[in-house]
Amino acid sequence: MQAKATAKFVRVSPRKARLVAQNVKGKPVEDAMNILRFTPQKAGGLIFKVMHSALANAEQLPGIDVDAMVVKQVIINEGPTWKRFLPRSMGRANRILKRTSHITVILEES
């Protein structure tokens, strides 16, 4: 049986979040949460919160052993990009892209 949690419009670049997500795929939930807890990147804490939510969702399902859960998938999709402008000299402007992500964590009983 599977448990799933999603966080949308998270203010982290999908490219950077995918680098962190690769470290926890296929691992037991306890090990994955320890890895994320001590990851210095911002995405580590955000994925940790989504994984914690998925674990809480799994506790609500009947007949699930929460201690035997494994990270089946961590999906990082690209959300909308916020466009901002940074004023430069001589009346010019540079575009700043503030990227967002949709983070989905799927846990499965091993």
UniProtKB/Swiss-Prot annotation:
Pfam families listed in its UniProt record: Ribosomal_L22
Coiled coil: none
One GO biological process term: translation
GO molecular function terms listed in the Swiss-Prot or TrEMBL record: rRNA binding; structural constituent of ribosome
Purpose of the protein: This protein binds specifically to 23S rRNA; its binding is stimulated by other ribosomal proteins, e.g. L4, L17, and L20. It is important during the early stages of 50S assembly. It makes multiple contacts with different domains of the 23S rRNA in the assembled 50S subunit and ribosome.
UniProt record similarity statement: Belongs to the universal ribosomal protein uL22 family.
Official protein name in the record: Large ribosomal subunit protein uL22
Organism encoding this protein: Oleidesulfovibrio alaskensis (strain ATCC BAA-1058 / DSM 17464 / G20)
Gene of this entry: rplV
